[in-house]
From Swiss-Prot:
UniProt GO BP: L-leucine biosynthetic process
Top-level taxon of origin: Bacteria
Region Disordered, annotated ranges: 423-444
InterPro entries: 3-IsopropMal_deHydase_lsu, Acnase/IPM_dHydase_lsu_aba_1/3, Acoase/IPM_deHydtase_lsu_aba, Aconitase_4Fe-4S_dom, IPM_dehydratase_rel_enz, IPMI_cat
Catalytic EC class: lyase
Protein name: 3-isopropylmalate dehydratase large subunit
Catalytic reaction list: (2R,3S)-3-isopropylmalate = (2S)-2-isopropylmalate
Similarity comment: Belongs to the aconitase/IPM isomerase family. LeuC type 1 subfamily.
Pfam assignment, any one: Aconitase
Organism per entry: Buchnera aphidicola subsp. Uroleucon rudbeckiae
The record's free-text note on cofactor binding: Binds 1 [4Fe-4S] cluster per subunit.
GO MF: 3-isopropylmalate dehydratase activity; 4 iron, 4 sulfur cluster binding; metal ion binding
Summary of the function given for this chain in its UniProt record: Catalyzes the isomerization between 2-isopropylmalate and 3-isopropylmalate, via the formation of 2-isopropylmaleate.
Length: 444
């Protein structure tokens, strides 16, 4: 029997049709939708008089555009309202389950699907959103797709996909105090570069990954796309099964036992071939923070901003110089000396209950600076409810934060939560691109 990687096992088990050029049509187990990338796909279905092939394997929520201050689809502007109205109409017409803003479970799609047990090991999962790689934390092959592909999956429950190369990143060592999963993946991206994963599906492994919680694993896989990888994967283990047990959409009874038998096979074979293998020791790692305008422009909190004049690559030198200009920063200075205007705790990367607990622990009995506007946006209604039951909302409010409703919020500038021109934010989100959180906004 040929040894296979985890990626190869999932890919091969979902092939509906194999073409002679090495590409394949894959069956899709779960299709996630939101209000921004789906309207045109539904319009195309209507124009071609097609139905949704598997509405029971399709799920929708509102997250990108929603207001986090009031439950009202008109609160984020006319375009946002139109997109949300279209999602309601489309889901009703095609019989697709929807968590709208009035549903107590509404929230970020990449938070909801795992916490409800929709995301399961061995699945193929797609969504019209680049951070779909989050679901790879469960040993699922998950990736973002474009609007035309959204239409294709709606119509056929399949998708044409080429076979990507395999990369293994083994993270080893001992986690230093105050270092989080976000620090670890930012460090990896900083060491390898924001294009290092191009053409690959990355499997993360090693003792550090093995000992991570599911929510920490989701943070790591969420950021795989920031290395330009197609997807990120972590093999399921006992912690995965424990997380999924008794979730609403998880298998139950005899089906649970059968599922467990299958899930336990979902790991790379001992002699499986990887096109690239990298080992990263994080034993001496300090908390990380980005200084530039892409995630690989990152340093330890106690380091100085690099001197771009010392960078050998002309491309990287120009990029660093441009980033410093946009960010209003100078080489050889410390970010700890730079004042911020806003703080955002939230996003598909870091808006789960463990993230909020960690932040609340730091903020307890402390006050933020008076000039700083800070918001906490839970990733879902369930996360919000749990946090309030634990009193975390009171800790945040007492420290000076605003406690908001679930949504993507400042992870992207598609709603009213954004940076004004020239404002600087410390953000829990996944991207620090120019204008990502608002035109002229500066994100760390």
């Amino acid at each position: 029997m040929i040894s296979k990687t985890l990626y190869q096992k999932i890919y091969d088990s979902h092939i509906v049709y194999q073409d002679k050029n090495g590409g394949a049509i894959l069956y899709i187990d779960l299709h996630l939708l939101h209000e921004v990338t789906s309207p045109q796909a539904f319009d195309a279905l209507r124009s071609k008089k097609r139905e949704v092939r598997q509405s029971k394997k399709t799920f929708a929520t509102m997250d990108h555009n929603v207001s986090t201050t009031i439950q009202n689809i008109s609160a984020s502007g006319s375009m946002a309202r139109k997109q949300m109205e279209q999602l309601i109409k489309n889901c009703q017409e095609f019989n697709i389950p929807l968590y709208d803003i009035n549903n107590p479970n509404q929230g970020i799609v990449h938070v909801i699907a795992p916490e409800k047990g929709m995301t399961l090991p061995g699945m193929t999962i797609v969504c019209g959103d680049s951070h779909t790689s989050t679901h790879g934390a469960f040993g699922a092959l998950a990736f973002g797709i474009g609007t035309s592909e959204v239409e294709h999956v709606l119509a056929t429950q399949t998708l044409k996909q080429k076979r990507f190369k395999n990369m293994k990143i083994e993270i080893i060592g001992k986690i230093p105090k105050f270092v989080t999963a976000k620090d670890i993946i930012l460090f990896v991206i900083g060491q390898l570069g924001s294009s290092s994963g191009t053409g690959y599906v990355i499997e993360f492994c090693g003792n550090i990954i093995k000992n991570m919680s599911m929510e920490e694993r989701m943070t790591v896989c969420n950021m795989a796309i920031e290395m330009x990888a197609k997807s990120g994967l972590i093999a399921p283990x006992x912690i995965t099964y424990k997380y999924l047990k008794d979730k609403i959409y998880s298998p139950s009874g005899l089906f649970w036992e059968k599922s467990l038998d299958y899930w336990k096979c979902l790991k790379s074979d001992k002699n499986a071939y990887f096109d690239k293998c990298i080992t990263v020791d994080i034993s001496n790692l300090a908390p990380q923070i980005t200084w530039g305008t892409n995630p690989d422009q990152v340093i330890s909190i106690d380091e100085k901003i690099p001197d771009y004049n010392n960078i050998n690559s002309e491309v990287k030198k120009d990029s660093a110089k441009s980033a410093c200009k946009y960010m209003g920063l100078k080489s050889n200075t410390y970010l700890t000396n730079i004042s911020i205007d806003k703080v955002f705790i939230g996003s598909x990367t870091n808006a789960r209950i463990e993230d909020l607990r960690s932040a609340a622990k730091i903020l307890q009995n402390r006050k933020i600076a008076k000039h700083v506007k800070a918001i906490v946006v839970p990733g879902s209604g369930l996360v919000k409810k749990k946090a309030e039951q634990e009193g975390l909302d009171k800790i945040f409010i007492d420290s000076g934060f605003e406690w908001r409703l679930p949504g993507c919020s400042m992870x992207l500038g598609m709603n009213k939560d954004r940076l004004n021109f020239g404002e600087r934010x410390x953000s829990h989100s996944n991207r620090n691109f120019e204008g990502r959180q608002g035109r002229g906004g500066r994100t760390h």
